[in-house]
Curated annotation (Swiss-Prot):
Reactions accelerated catalytically: RNA(n) + a ribonucleoside 5'-triphosphate = RNA(n+1) + diphosphate
Subunit structure: The RNAP catalytic core consists of 2 alpha, 1 beta, 1 beta' and 1 omega subunit. When a sigma factor is associated with the core the holoenzyme is formed, which can initiate transcription.
PROSITE patterns for this protein: RNA_POL_BETA
EC number(s) on file: 2.7.7.6
CDD domains noted in UniProt: RNA_pol_B_RPB2 (cd00653)
Top-level taxon of the source organism: Bacteria
Keyword Nucleotide-binding: no
GO-annotated molecular function: DNA binding; DNA-directed RNA polymerase activity; ribonucleoside binding
Keywords: DNA-directed RNA polymerase, Nucleotidyltransferase, Transcription, Transferase
GO cellular component, one term: DNA-directed RNA polymerase complex
Enzyme class of the recorded protein, top EC level: transferase
Protein name: DNA-directed RNA polymerase subunit beta
Gene coding for it: rpoB
Length: 1346
């Protein structure tokens, strides 16, 4: 493959053996595509906003004389861009405008005659928009809507696993789940009667449902049973014989015909007997009367006496000898009996009809009405209306396309299309299928199969929520349409947008699936957007989810990651999308496979869902292929119907596209994943998401090859949109001169990229972009121009490469503790910047408005030294706990003054006492620097001096920004003009002496060139007009007042930056789940060092490896040592052999990229000498290698790289103790491991309390750092002090240090006076106990007399 100039700067050596069949899909497409489908105008009207409108409109009035029709919708432009929304704390959204048509029909004319039509565009609230990175900005914070995994609509058959009834009998059930509407359940009881439930209410016999659908008993029996015909002739009863029905039965009488006995009485009828009967063509059998008496035969039809017209026997009655005699008397010569048996044709429906109390449709409807609406008197219309609305009304019930497809496939109806409501046949098919399963024909469904669970993405959930809003509006509109006078009414008067925007706002703001984005680092952002949750509205709940739902299912293969899931109560309920997975049009997850034809894998890739995959045989990606491209083993491990098996190449239909297909993005970042235990890999993939971006990002030496892709897709880097040459670079912008072949007609050909500088993320880490390119460099589309947080030259870089040794060191690495060298801290390897935002709000109160000012009562000069005259802290001030950031005073109510205070007020004026100090102060344990201040003032409130200063600064910055942009474009235009003029024969030197503006006025003879010049003049005018317009918009935005919440006058936001160095107590981890806490930071000279005197950075405990079974970390250490070693060797070659020939460098570098079993993708013949030297210099810090999961470097390749670096093949070095200078007695495993600093910093957790707030009832200190609380001294701790006999210490703990109110106040005063005595009193808890006992009506009093 060809590398661009940028990519040639540093290339990762790939150890992957398998060829890449397909590129990894764009990682955020699940979010972006879903929302795009929702928001874009869809002319078919099947998805998105269009579908929501079509499902509600037209809304007709009750009388039908008028209706409101939907025509089309459009979204406006957002008022503020994403960054402005974040600063101002508003939602990034656009206004939704819908064109509606009000049609009024003429009452007097024939039906359908239109009297009047009025069209109007109506505002329907704001619709939040998705940013280009798949997030939403809601009230200024970035949020992500997590996709939900829920049970697909359709029909499901299941059983209770024998748990319901004490006998352990398995009871089968069927459940029809619509997309919206009532659930319909059918279930068997222990007596094998079939019952129906609607919406999980009280159960009714299932035949009530059939009667309500207008079936009679006779029709019901005809639908579910075959019949056997009996004839009566001359007093002899004969039955028509279908021989196959006798199989396995016991002969109750001699089975004989034509004088031949086939089966004797009491013998079992076998297949041989049946064959004999069929051979002799026996169609009827004479039956003795006793047979009828013994067998409970059930009549299939109603039989009516020909003489009297009375019913002799009803359908489903049991035939007795008396009834038989009556039938014979009334001249009926033949009758039908339903055919049932114990084995495969149970009498379930027949038995159910006997427990069914209803006999006609009306009774059935009333019974259903009573069950759904207990206590309401039923009327015929109400009962019919309710039943119709349950399953047969489109506005109340919708199976959806998915539901209909799943339903038809499960009950065997042809085709995937059909109505969204249920039909009679649908209900019958469900009952028939359920009875077939009970009869032993068919199997129940696996609810955890991914063919039965589907993904609901953002777009679909937003659409549902929007529909909810529209339904609320619909009722109001229908009322208003029916009120009568519509002569002057416009659509605008009918629609109230409040309920719609409220529903949308509620979803985006407070739904369980709308989550605060995890913005620790680029990986955590991407993973959060690819998360799939089974929780949320319409999903599972943590408490009710069992083991099966959480478990890994065979259908997860390539769809959901089996590794990445949280530890704790949510395990298995929150999953991550596998790398190549996507959703299909029905919302089921599908994964790509390579087609295999006649044992030869092709390059054709097909996506299969879990349902489709079941019928194919699929081989692993690791199946070996010979030089002819054929699968070359006799038996190949493959998967079929969820089981692993071995089959020959000819039987194989598909094979995996990649070994990383089964895992998620986070898991595929772990090198040597295949050597780690799954539990530790889970911790590894979860902890990478908690890594804090370091000050100087450092790409991993040992990676997996997906780092670059992740950094680009995450959106934290800046990617070139078009090819060109870098024209200008500074810290905040990059200007690219676009190549001519990518220019649009009439365009200046300049791309300007603005960088984000020192912004706060959701997790208070720092977002900052730094350019990676230099002026004059050629770039192509897709190149990385600037690194974001945790990226290094376009590679994801979550941590640092550290030199580690596995050895014990004086017990400082006991229990996973980590010992680090002072050098790590000095070099700022793990120093991170954290930005905190503090807001101070000045409100309007009953007593007057709060004021932000520097005039604060009872505060000394020193405390105000960092504030300006407006009472706001300066940018750049270094603040410590307790410092005032924003001075604010609040009016307080009038209090009764003492004479002394009155005197003081008379002398010193009013101010001091009628306001109280409510300033914003720095929190405890925060030492920081103020980096930014924002002031927001309500419209109509006068801005203070600081607000005006900030406004002026912003205006200057905006003007400078736009002016520079304009200048760049202007220069580009003048360059073009100069080229045209010189080309037309004008003298260049003369032109350069003229003012540039006059170039555009020069007239030339060549008409074509003159037209080009005219185009350029037009372009210049457009650019100038754009500049003026943009500056005007910017100015208006900056100077206008802010839209603040009611009652808020002013908001001041102060941003503080804290630099956190590595220190004992911080949590660190590798990528293999090997986590630990720093126990000590040791001087460099005391650390173990190698024979060249190079000390190690980190010492880890070797006992952390064997029991955890994450050997990947050891392999990573060895490979890291080799990668670093070859880099150092290259550096020595170039630096210390000044006159070294470039060919030797080229040879060595080429050898590095070519060795090993993997196909080589790097050919240095395509690189010029300068590019080779640039590449070599970028490899000084080590050769970055990629070892993809399940396809990585093997032991031989690691040994070979160690040899190339002139290092021992064992990967172990002889170390010397830095303190004693004595060598350790055996070689130690030393190497480079990629270590992360996790967002669990000791500074955020360490906390100590002196005195503070107390709980209101118990008067005990509060708990937790946020409340400045104390340490809990619990029951067991009390036992410990009792055991030691430390009586006074215990007394102190339970009284003055806790809830003895008087004692603690006195103690405090004593300590201030230097007197350290204590007098314990009565703990408040005792009083609480007394009160609680009294609340039980037991009078208890404390006798303190003696």
């Amino acid at each position: 493959m060809g590398y661009s100039y940028t990519e040639k700067k540093r290339i990762r050596k790939d150890f992957g053996k398998r060829p890449q069949v397909m590129e990894k899909p764009y990682l955020l497409s699940i979010q972006l595509d879903s929302f795009k489908r929702f928001i874009e105008v869809d002319l078919t009207g099947e998805v998105g906003l269009e579908a929501a409108f079509n499902s509600i409109f037209p809304i007709a009035s009750y009388s039908g004389t008028s209706e409101l029709q939907y025509v089309s919708y459009r979204l406006g432009e957002p008022v503020f861009d994403v960054k402005e929304c974040q600063i101002r704390g508003v939602t990034y959204s656009a206004s939704l405008r819908v064109k509606l048509r009000l049609v009024i029909y003429d009452r007097d004319a024939p039906a359908g005659t239109v009297k009047d039509i009025r069209e109007q565009e109506v505002y329907m609230g704001e619709m939040p928009l998705m940013t280009e990175n798949g997030t939403f900005v809601i009230n200024g914070t970035e949020r992500v809507i997590v996709s939900q995994l829920h049970r697909s609509p359709g029909v499901f058959f299941d059983h209770d696993k024998g748990k319901t009834h004490s006998s352990g009998k398995v009871l089968y059930n069927a459940r029809v789940i619509p997309y919206r509407g009532s659930w319909l359940d059918f279930e068997f009881d222990p007596k094998d009667n079939l019952f129906v439930r609607i919406d999980r209410r009280r159960k009714l016999p299932a035949t009530i449902m059939l009667r309500a659908l207008e079936y009679s008993t006779q029709e019901i029996l005809a639908i579910f049973y075959d019949t056997t015909k009996f004839d009566i002739k001359d007093g002899v009863i004969s039955m028509s014989l279908i021989a196959d029905r006798l199989r396995g039965e016991m002969a109750l009488f001699d089975i004989a015909a034509n004088g031949k006995i086939y089966v004797e009485q009491g013998k079992r009828i076998t297949a041989r007997h049946i064959k004999q009967l069929e051979k002799d063509n026996i169609n009827t059998l004479d039956v003795p009367v006793e047979y009828i008496a013994e067998k409970d035969l059930v009549v299939a039809k109603d039989y009516i006496s020909k003489e009297t017209g009375e019913i002799i026997v009803s359908a489903n009655d049991i035939l007795t000898l008396e009834i038989l005699a009556e039938l014979t008397q009334s001249g009926i010569t033949s009758f039908d009996i339903i055919y049932t048996n114990e084995l495969d044709c149970g009498s379930f429906i027949s038995d159910t009809l006997r427990v069914d109390s209803s006999s006609n449709r009306l009774e059935a409807l009333v019974e259903i009405y009573r069950m759904m609406r207990p206590g309401e008197p039923p009327t015929k219309d109400a009962a019919e209306g309710l039943f119709h609305n349950l399953f047969f009304a489109e506005e109340r019930y919708e199976l959806s396309k998915v539901g209909r497809m799943k339903f038809n496939r499960r009950v065997g109806i042809d085709g995937d299309e059909g109505a969204g409501i249920l039909s009679k046949d649908d209900i019958l098919s469900v009952m028939k299928t359920l009875i077939a399963i009970r009869n032993g024909d068919g199997i129940v469904d696996d609810i955890d199969h991914l063919g039965n669970r589907r993904i609901r993405c953002v777009g679909e959930m937003a659409e549902n929520q929007f529909r909810v809003g529209l339904v609320r509006v619909e009722r109001a509109v229908r009322e208003r349409l029916s009120l009568g006078d519509l002569d002057a009414t416009m659509p605008q008067d009918l629609i109230n947008a409040k309920p719609i925007s409220a529903a949308v706002k509620e979803f985006f703001g407070s739904s369980q699936l709308s989550q605060f984005m995890d913005q620790n680092n680029p990986l955590s952002e991407v993973t959060h957007k690819r998360r799939i949750s089974a929780l949320g509205p319409g999903g599972l709940t943590r408490e009710r989810a069992g083991f099966e739902v959480r478990d890994v299912h065979p259908t997860h293969y390539g769809r959901l990651c089996p590794i990445e899931t949280p530890e704790g109560p949510n395990i298995g309920l929150i999953n991550s999308l596998a790398t190549f997975s996507r959703t299909n049009s029905y919302g089921f997850l599908e994964t790509p496979y390579r087609k295999v034809e006649n044992g030869k894998p092709t390059d054709q890739v097909e996506y299969l869902s879990a349902i489709e995959e079941g019928s194919f045989v699929i081989a692993q990606a690791s199946a070996s292929i010979d030089e002819n491209g054929l699968l070359d083993e006799e038996l190949i491990p493959c998967r079929h119907k969820g089981e692993s098996t071995f089959l020959s190449p000819a039987d194989i239909d598909y094979m995996d596209v990649s070994p990383q297909q089964i895992i998620s993005v986070a898991a595929s970042l772990i090198p040597f994943l295949e050597h780690d235990d799954a539990n530790r890999a889970l911790m590894g993939s979860n902890m990478q998401r908690q890594a804090v971006p370091t000050l100087r990002a450092d790409k991993p030496l040992v990676g997996t090859g997906i780092e670059r892709r992740l950094a680009i897709d995450s959106g934290v880097t800046i990617i070139a949109k078009r090819s060109g040459v870098i024209d200008y670079v500074d810290a905040s912008r990059i200007v690219v001169k676009v190549d001519d072949n990518e220019l649009l007609p009439g365009e200046a050909g300049i791309d300007i990229y603005n960088l984000t500088k020192y912004t706060r993320s959701n997790q208070n880490t720092c977002i900052n972009q730094k350019p990676t390119c230099e002026p004059g460099e050629p770039i192509v589309r897709g190149d990385v121009l600037a690194d974001g947080p945790s990226t290094d030259m376009g590679d994801l870089a979550l941590g640092q490469n550290m030199k580690i040794a596995f050895m014990p060191w004086n017990g400082y690495n006991f229990e996973d503790s980590i010992l680090i060298s002072e050098r790590v801290s000095q070099e700022d390897r793990f120093t991170t910047i954290h930005i905190q935002e503090f807001s101070c709000v000045a409100r309007e109160t009953k007593l007057g408005s709060e004021e932000i000012s520097a005039d604060i009562p009872n505060v000394g000069e020193a405390a105000l030294s960092k504030l300006d005259e407006s009472g706001i802290v300066y940018v750049g001030a270094e603040v410590k706990p307790g410092d005032i950031l924003v001075g604010k005073v609040t009016p307080k109510g009038e209090t009764q003054l003492t004479p002394e205070e009155k005197l003081l007020r008379a002398i010193f004026g009013e101010k001091a006492s009628d306001v109280k100090d409510s300033s914003l102060r720095v929190a405890a344990s925060t030492y920081a620097t103020v980096i930014d201040v924002q002031v927001f003032t309500r419209d109509g409130v006068e801005k203070d001096k600081r607000a005006l200063e900030i406004e002026e600064m912003q205006l200057k910055a905006a003007k400078k920004d736009l002016t520079e942009k304009f200048k760049i474009l202007e220069n580009a235009i003048y360059e073009k003009a100069l080229a045209i003029l010189v080309g037309a024969g004008q003298d260049e030197a003369r032109l350069l002496q003229m003012p540039r503006a006059q170039w555009l006025e020069v007239q030339i003879d060549d008409e074509t060139k003159q037209s080009y010049l005219d185009q350029i003049i037009t372009q210049y005018d457009e650019v100038k007009a754009d500049y003026d317009k943009e500056f005007d918009i910017k100015r208006r935005k900056i100077t206008q007042g802010d839209d603040l919440a009611p009652g808020v006058q002013k908001i001041v936001k102060v941003y503080l930056a804290v630099r956190r160095r590595l220190q004992p107590g911080d949590k660190m981890a590798g990528r293999h789940g090997n986590k630990g806490v720093i126990s000590n930071i040791v001087p460099v000279e005391d650390m173990p060092h190698d024979e060249f005197g190079v000390p190690v950075d980190i010492v880890l405990n070797p006992l952390g490896v064997p029991s955890r079974m994450n050997i990947g970390q050891v392999l990573e250490t060895h490979l890291g040592l080799a990668a670093k070693g070859v880099g150092e060797k290259l550096e020595r070659m170039i630096k210390y052999q000044r006159d070294i020939e470039i060919t030797k460098v080229r040879e060595f570098v080429q050898k590095l990229y070519s060795f090993g079993d993997a196909p080589c993708h790097v050919d240095l013949n395509d690189f010029d000498d300068e590019a080779v030297m640039r590449l070599a210099k970028n490899l000084y810090k080590g050769l970055p290698v990629a070892t993809p999961a399940f396809d990585g470097a093997n032991e031989g390749e690691i040994r070979e790289l160690l040899r190339m670096a002139d290092l021992p093949e064992s990967g172990q070095l002889q170390l010397t103790d830095g303190r004693t200078g004595i060598q350790f007695e055996r070689p130690v495993t030393v190497g480079y491991m990629y270590m992360l600093k996790l967002n669990h910093l000791v500074d955020d957790k360490m906390h100590a309390r002196s005195t503070g707030s107390y709980s209101l009832v118990t008067q005990q200190p509060l708990g937790g750092k946020a409340q400045f609380g104390g340490q809990r001294f619990g029951e067991m701790e009390v036992w410990a002090l009792e055991a030691y006999g430390a009586a006074y210490t215990l007394q102190e703990m339970l009284t003055v240090k806790s809830d003895d109110v008087n004692g603690r106040t006195k103690m405090y005063k004593n300590i201030v006076d230097g007197d350290h005595r204590m007098e314990p009193g009565m703990p408040e808890s005792f009083n609480v106990l007394l009160k609680e006992i009294r609340s039980l009506s037991i009078n208890i009093e404390l006798d303190e007399s003696n």
